[in-house]
Structure formats: C-alpha cells, structure tokens
C-alpha cells in the first residue's frame, strides 16, 4: 500500500523518483513512469542509531545527527556490517527489529573487539554511531543504485529526514540524484 500512496503523491509521467522512508527500518518506493511502483526494505534506518544513542547519551535519538557526525566511520566495521545476508537478498524483501536489534549490534561490535556497554570509550561510541549512520545511508544508496540507477530524485521521509548527518551521507552516496526531505516537495 505504501508504494501506491507514494506513487499518488510523488509519481511523475516523465522521470523515475525514489521515496526513501527512514523509520526504525529504511524502505524505498521506486516510482517509474507508466509502471507499477516497487517497494521493499533496505535495512536498518534509525533503530540501531537510536538504540546506540540512548545507551551512550541518554537521549532517545541523535538530534540532527550531531553526535554521530563527530565520530569517524570505521570502514572495516562497515564492510562487515554490509556482509549481513539480508543485504544480498533480491526484492521484494522485508526486515525489522527481529534482525536489526540490540543483539545484532552486540554481536557485530563483539566481532570487532568492541564493547556495547555504556562504559565504552566516548570517542569509540561516537565512531560506532558514525559507522551505523553510514550503514543506513549505504544500505539505502545500494538499493537505489541497484534497482533505480536512472532516478533523478530521492525524496526522504520519516524520522531519518530530520537527521542532517544521515541526509548528507545519502546525498554523498548518490551524487547524480537530488536528495531532499519530503517537506521540500510540499
């Protein structure tokens, strides 16, 4: 139902548009001219970011992505996270907190010799947040590049659209596309 709703709001007769909805998980709707919309989950959206942020800052979410933006992405951790089998599945596919949850996060960190407790080094905690943000951005970008490389616009809705760091990272991954929050579309 969501891709059809997105089609009615944002569909165009002359160009392909992608709507990325970033809530706990991220999903996209691919809106092609004269074709039925295609929608599927990409992977984690805010769920891992919010869980990690709350554990280390006491805040329910990373306001504007400022805390995560102060960290450094660990590329080796990111490559490992992207090896999660879900990312290789073809659409239509669905995921949720049954996969991308605190247990997944703990196991991922442990595989890199990191702790997930609040006693973690403050810089390491920011680096984890930055890496998780990059994971969400790359999961969305990979899905778009693979299934809608001709898209001209990526319209972002959901809570993730309020995370400036996440929006910046998505735009960096998709330089040939205009990435903007849905409120910019009216």
Where are these regions (language model features)?
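Glycine-rich phosphate-binding loop plus the immediately following alpha-helix
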Residues: 1-10, 18-89
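A general structural motif
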Residues: 14-16, 151
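Glycine-rich beta-strand-to-loop/alpha-helix junction loops that act as flexible
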Residues: 22-25, 152-162
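Glycine-rich phosphate-binding/hydrolytic loop that grips phosphoryl groups
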Residues: 1, 130, 134, 183-186
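A contiguous, well-structured pocket-lining segment that forms one wall/lid of small-molecule binding clefts
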Residues: 59-60, 66-153, 164-177
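A short glycine/serine-rich beta->alpha loop
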Residues: 37-39, 123, 181-186
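Conserved beta-strand segments of alpha/beta enzyme cores
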Residues: 18, 178-180
């Amino acid at each position: 139902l969501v891709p059809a709703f997105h089609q009615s709001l944002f569909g165009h007769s002359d160009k392909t548009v992608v709507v990325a909805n970033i809530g706990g998980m991220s999903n996209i709707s691919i809106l092609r001219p004269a074709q039925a919309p295609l929608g599927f989950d990409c992977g984690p959206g805010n769920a891992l970011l919010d869980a990690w942020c709350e554990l280390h800052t006491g805040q329910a979410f990373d306001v504007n992505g400022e805390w995560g933006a102060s960290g450094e992405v660990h590329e080796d951790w990111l490559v490992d996270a992207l090896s999660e089998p879900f990312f290789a599945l073809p659409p239509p596919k669905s995921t949720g907190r049954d996969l991308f949850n605190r247990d997944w996060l703990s196991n991922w960190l442990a595989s890199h010799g990191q702790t997930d407790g609040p006693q973690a080094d403050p810089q390491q905690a920011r680096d984890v947040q930055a890496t998780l943000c990059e994971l969400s951005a790359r999961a969305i970008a990979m899905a778009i590049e693979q299934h809608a490389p001709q898209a001209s616009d990526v319209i972002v809705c959901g809570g993730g659209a309020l995370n400036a760091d996440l929006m910046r990272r998505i735009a960096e991954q998709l330089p040939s596309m205009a990435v903007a929050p849905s409120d910019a579309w009216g």
